[in-house]
Amino acid sequence: SNKISYGIRRRYLQGYELDSVMNYPLREAVIMYILYGECEKMRSATEGIYRRYPKCVCDVLMNFLGTHDTKRILTVFGGDSGDGRTADELAHMKLEREQLKTGINRLKRAYVIVAAMFGVPSVFYGDEAGLEGYDDPFCRRPFPWKHQNNELTSFFRRIGKLRRSE
């Protein structure tokens, strides 16, 4: 890879250290495309990934939208940054009805892109169930077992089946 970290070229993907890496460049490009229509960022990111990694690495990249280190993707796509709010406020905040509707629509579009790309689509627990949350620790809430968004869960299941059938 062309990864330079702390001033040193890293050799993570040469068979001795890692089999894959988390594809943050794709995540950021998909978010920017869905939120702001930035086609150029999407093109640049995907071309850059192909340029930096051989096909055998591209085929196993971990493609994702949410992680334990980021705001919940539904919250990001719902459009409420939570900026300027106290931890107590963030602990109890939920998206408004229209924000939730917008967030779900955007999340579906984004996940179709992730699932259609080279690499391995990954879903952070709860994203498929409509879990909301802001920065840590609010992105690490427990899975909403009795309060899942069944429409969203079914959507993720359908896309997974489509991906496997390719």
Label each region the model flagged.
Residues 21-28, 81-86, 103-106, 154:
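A broad, low-specificity signal for short, low-complexity segments enriched in glycine/proline
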Residues 1-61, 113, 130-161:
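Active-site-proximal helices and loops of the catalytic beta/alpha 8
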Residues 39-49, 83-108:
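Aromatic-anchored helix/helix-loop segment that forms the rim or "lid"
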Residues 12-19, 63-95, 111-150:
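Aromatic/acidic polysaccharide-binding cleft in carbohydrate-active enzymes
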